[in-house]
Curated annotation (Swiss-Prot):
GO molecular function, one term: identical protein binding
Full protein name: Talin rod domain-containing protein 1
Natural source organism: Homo sapiens
Xref: PANTHER family: TALIN ROD DOMAIN-CONTAINING PROTEIN 1
Alphabetized Gene3D superfamilies for the sequence: Alpha-catenin/vinculin-like, Talin, central domain
Gene coding for it: TLNRD1
Domain of life: Eukaryota
Inducing or repressing factors: Down-regulated by microRNA MIR574-3p.
Record-annotated disulphide pairs: none
Record key words, sorted: Acetylation
GO terms for cellular component: stress fiber
Annotated stretches, region: Disordered: 1-26
Role description: Actin-binding protein which may have an oncogenic function and regulates cell proliferation, migration and invasion in cancer cells.
Assembly and oligomerization: May homodimerize. Interacts with F-actin.
Length: 362
């Protein structure tokens, strides 16, 4: 998962490379790191908004893209998985600091991708553990599944939006075959999940309108996707500004089609019923979600610090400030992991933690 530098404390990292060495590095790895920072930050914030800031108690079932398979685990299994992942997160936090300090922006970007995926997985497991702990309290009634998993389809919508945003914002010179392949595969994977999920919901719907609307929504989405992916293939075969502009042009209808389909699919009648829990169950849930929020908030700050450093590679007072913020945010990640582990072990809050209905992660 990470390099051998993991043996050092999280708050420490390798000595910074000379400013001249960092400033002389190719701008391409830095630009990619900025892009990775934006994507990881958006993904972590979305998952936190959906799973940690919700007042509802629902299981988190991981099927389809980015599955971690933990949805059917017991609380004890979730707890052990989360604690193990906090250790991996500490390793990655140290690695990304070291790589950045040595001017290895490409490696830092790769580590950040892994860190972002790990935070998402940890958040999903934490939300599921919080649900399991809450429904285990006296008087609790478990959630009833609906036709659609709001979390999964909303994640897919976000990924499609991100892929289309990349196509709109990337200059022609940076549209490498590898980037186009990654975007195409990401779009196809998430669109397939949406298609399968909505087809299943259509089959199980009781009223005629819903059955037909799911089918029509999928058809609209598929048509828009085919038009966009044809433009992406054209850019790969015959790159030109005209071909690139077509990607931007046809990405709009796909985003609109996916937004409409997910908006319909997440109407209350398709989502089942959240668990009913007592005040005791709510307190247990809040403690675990609050611990997870401490981790996510710190990782969002870490990502923002990395972005600032990637954009200001030439030294100076700002660079020193950014490095200090990076060290502080890395320490906050470590502290958040400790709080989450303690909340899971004790099923109570080790300190006053943010309420689950607070504002979105900033």
């Amino acid at each position: 998962m990470a390099s051998g530098s993991a043996g050092k404390p999280t708050g420490e990292a390798a000595s910074p490379a000379p400013a001249s060495a960092i400033g002389g590095a190719s701008s391409q790895p830095r630009k990619r790191l900025v892009s990775v920072c934006d994507h990881c930050k958006g993904k972590m914030q979305l998952v936190a908004d959906l799973l940690l800031l919700s007042s509802e108690a629902r299981p988190v079932l991981f099927e389809g893209p980015a599955s971690s398979g933990a949805g059917a685990e017991s609380f004890e299994q979730c707890r052990d998985t989360i604690i193990a992942r906090t250790k991996g997160l500490s390793i990655l936090t140290h690695d990304v600091q070291s790589q950045l300090n040595m001017g290895r922006f490409g490696e830092a970007g790769d580590s950040l991708v892994e860190l972002g995926d790990l935070v998402v997985s940890l958040t999903e497991c934490s939300a599921h553990a919080a649900y399991l702990a809450a429904v285990a309290t006296p008087g609790a009634q478990p959630a009833q599944p609906g036709l659609v998993d709001r979390y999964r389809v909303t994640r897919c919508r976000h990924e499609v939006e991100q892929g289309c945003a990349v196509l709109r914002a990337t200059p022609l010179a940076d549209m490498t075959p590898q980037l186009l392949l990654e975007v195409s595969q990401g779009l196809s994977r998430n669109l397939k999940f949406l298609t399968d999920a909505c087809a299943l919901a259509s089959d199980k719907s009781r009223d005629r309108f819903s059955r037909e609307q799911f089918k029509l929504g999928v058809k609209c989405m598929s048509t828009s996707a085919s038009a966009l992916l044809a433009c992406v293939r054209e850019v790969k075969v015959a790159p030109s500004e005209l071909a690139r502009s077509r990607c931007a042009l046809f990405s709009g209808p796909l985003v609109q089609a996916v937004s409409a389909l997910v908006g319909f699919a997440t109407e209350p009648q398709f989502l089942g019923r959240a668990a009913a829990v007592s005040a005791e169950g709510k307190a247990v849930q809040t403690a675990i979600l609050g611990g997870a929020m401490s981790v996510v908030s710190a990782c969002v700050l870490l990502t923002q610090c990395l972005r600032d450093l990637a954009q200001h590679p030439d030294g100076g007072a700002k660079m020193s400030d950014h490095r200090e913020r990076l060290r502080n945010s890395a320490c906050a990640v470590s502290e958040g992991c400790t709080l989450l582990s303690q909340a899971l072990r004790e099923r109570s809050s080790p300190r006053t933690l943010p309420p689950v209905n607070s504002n979105s992660v900033n």
